[in-house]
């Protein structure tokens, strides 16, 4: 298959994905003897198109599953999408509002038709984006959280938890969105710092003897106050506990109670208790059996309990109430105060802590089981490990979970109320005498259904489902650290509760994609980046490699066009290296193993050794999900070792007359390039398929090719030392040429004073490389080379590299250069000495590491002595 002179991602990627899908390459293996590897995609919301965070998330998943497929696993990467209750409903309502229509105008059934239309439209966008990213998904198993099968799972879980007493209906403080008129989960509340005020009021004692000072940021809620609390250890208030105060405006008597929740050092040390409008106040109210007085309605307007403020918006009420208190001389002071205020992620409304009758999941036992499971062999491994502490901490302090939502789009709660008796019936099927019952109109929190995602997508609750039996539990979950609480934790406790097993073995957590300046990407800042635009410009492979290798697990990623472009340059380098290799391999070249009986050159042995080292490194790091380090290892090997050195060195035999040596070089080129493509494939699926198809190969696609394996027979340790010596000499000569302004095209005499006879022999045997890369007019390699008085000398591991300078150099400049080199070597010696004199390092570091530092010291000392001697020689 022909490779064009220039890498064009559009040409390379066009039609490739469709071919993979059509040929069924992403379907699980029919060989059931294989070990399985499963990842279920974190389902994107059908609210819109995918962003860079989704691209990062799914790229990591695809890399893992492609690699596991190549390693011989029966691999399933299962796609799906989330109905995203409030988020999607808000989008659909906004679209209707543009036409002057509300959901109530349409009614529930017609509105849901509109929502399903929205889902179908955006699901097709998402699939197209998955395709452009090259995700190896098995579309025959695609799931949606409102699918019939998943709905069945949701109903079963709800009913089972209700029958166990874990799900209950009750009154609690929830996050209330007065604009969308629904309860919200914590993740749907965005906290923002807002400029507000601290209002300090007088609450007069009922006996007329003075007042107690109370501070609040929400004066409108004081209309629902039912007590004042102070800390029992606060000496200031010991004598007033048990007394009463008069609630301003309302006139209701409030008891002063003792509760250790109160912070003695905060404010006046006394706080008002409004159980119906604050979570902490509600819990205090429960302890002291206080009345719950709700003073607002579901629209955020004051109700009949607010007296003369009835019908006012809550914020208008705040202003008027403060003015009224000023008139009564009950305002002590008003302080400017910046505080965190929750806003609805969807509507933008200020969220109201609100006492409401909702459905809840009792979390104590579920959380305990999740924590206990982490102490067993069935534990889940977190990457990075520090996030296990985050998970444990949340589970230890968990509150009951509000699962009902006042929406239409979602799983309607499978509970019915008898029209006459009020009896509650909960079941997977509706009551037989349905005419006597009214179903609960609320739907379940989106996270309730997505918490079942790892097993509901595989056929559960049908325990005989082939997919469930074969592919559950899944192997890895890849997701952002920002949803450990809201999704990861819930999948864990639901998986344990309903399957008695962890839902996944590993959790790989990544951070957020940020703008280059570190700020969060957002529409309001206008700094968002559409991944599809990046793909159109640079190709999917460039974006994927950047996303995968640009960060380490658990850390945020800063998007950089410059870095994506540098990956594009890297792919161009690979492309050009592949074209050279293919042109020299020839069309008729057959797939052959490396002939170890043949005369492998130093370059051949070295590149094969470095290849095997890279295979080992990449495999090991990938198993630890250290893809940033994988990227560095691949880049260094491909760019430096293969393209810059081996390809150039291979031109020596390829331009020579030794046909046997040419054939060996072709074999090594082909073998190395083939293995490079296999290692790169999970990261860059498109360009590697294109190049691999052009190489001599077996099989239909690189997707199904085997992962490279380390071959001990192709590791030649001694080649590394020799190559290191040659490369250092070549770099030294080139650097010296630059310093004396002598181009590489100009032949100059070069002398190499070898450190010993063994090195002299080795360098002489490999002088062809020195001739090619250094372009000498004469090359003299010997242990007893005489160094001319006027010469440029570089001290290297192998000895000294000497360029006679007669007519080439200014002596004063050369002395200055050597003195700078001497200072640099002294700095390195000081660094190594400091390390080796550090008792902590010497006692803890492996012996191999310590010996390496000692070797470095010896090398630096030898270089230092040589440079110093040369300076003295020139000065003499």
From Swiss-Prot:
A motif ('HIGH' region) lies at residues 44-54. Its main location: cytoplasm. Residues 805-876 form a coiled coil. Monomer. Belongs to the class-I aminoacyl-tRNA synthetase family. ValS type 1 subfamily. It is an enzyme of class 6 (ligase). It comes from Staphylococcus aureus (strain bovine RF122 / ET3-1). Its EC number is 6.1.1.9. A motif ('KMSKS' region) lies at residues 520-524. It comes from the Bacteria. Keywords: Aminoacyl-tRNA synthetase, ATP-binding, Coiled coil, Cytoplasm, Ligase, Nucleotide-binding, Protein biosynthesis. This is Valine--tRNA ligase. It is found in: Cytoplasm. The keyword Cell cycle does not apply. One of its GO terms (biological process) is valyl-tRNA aminoacylation. ATP binds at residue 523. Catalyzes the attachment of valine to tRNA(Val). As ValRS can inadvertently accommodate and process structurally similar amino acids such as threonine, to avoid such errors, it has a 'posttransfer' editing activity that hydrolyzes mischarged Thr-tRNA(Val) in a tRNA-dependent manner. InterPro entries: aa-tRNA-synth_I_CS, aa-tRNA-synth_Ia, Anticodon_Ia_Val, M/V/L/I-tRNA-synth_anticd-bd, Rossmann-like_a/b/a_fold, tRNA-bd_arm, tRNAsynth_Ia_anticodon-bd, Val-tRNA_synth_C_sf.
